Amino acid sequence: SLKGGQHMADTVLNTTVFDGATKLITHYNVVSDNSGSTTKIVDVSTLASNNGKTCKTVRLNKVSFNVSVTAPADAIRMQWDADTDVVFQSLAGEMEYDYSSFGGLKNTEATGFTGDVNVVLPACTAGDTGTIVCEWIKVYES
C-alpha cells in the first residue's frame, strides 16, 4: 500500500543484449505511472574493453521503437549525458531509423560529457509505454 507522499515509479526494464568488441545492443522498455523517469541505457564505464582500450562513447547506428504517449509533447528523449544533457533523438510512434550509412549519430561531446546515454520519459499519462532497441557502435579512447 502507498502511504502519504509516496508514489510508485515508472516500471523500467533496461538490459544490455550484446556487448561486443565494436557493437552494443540495448533494450529498454517503460510503462509509466505518470511520474516520468530518466534511465541510463548506456554506461560506458561498464562496457567491455577492446585490446585493453576503454570505450569512451557510443554512436547510435540503428534504433527501432514503439512509443505510445497520449500527448505528443511527452515523446521519449534520448540524451548524451553531459553537464547539460544534449537531446539527440526524440521518439514517438512506431519507427526505425538506420544511421549506418554514415557511421551513426555521434556524441556531441558537450562540456562535461561522460559518454553515457540517458532516456527520458517526461511526466506523462499513466499507462503510456515505450520500447526502444538500439544498436550502438563503440568508440574507444585513442
Name these PLM-found stretches.
Residues 85-106:
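An anionic, turn-rich surface loop/hairpin at beta-sheet edges
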Residues 8-22, 122-142:
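C-terminal interaction-tip segments
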Residues 57-69:
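A short beta-strand element within beta-rich, extracytoplasmic domains
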Residues 12, 70-74, 113, 126-128:
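Short loop/turn segments at connectors of secondary-structure elements within structured domains
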Residues 9-51:
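Solvent-exposed, flexible loop/coil segments flanking beta-strands in beta-rich domains
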Residues 1-7:
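Short, Lys/Arg-enriched N-terminal segments with co-localized hydrophobic residues
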Residues 69-91:
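Short, surface-exposed beta-strand/strand-loop-strand elements in extracellular ectodomains
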Residues 104-128:
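Noncatalytic modules at the cell exterior or secretory-pathway interfaces
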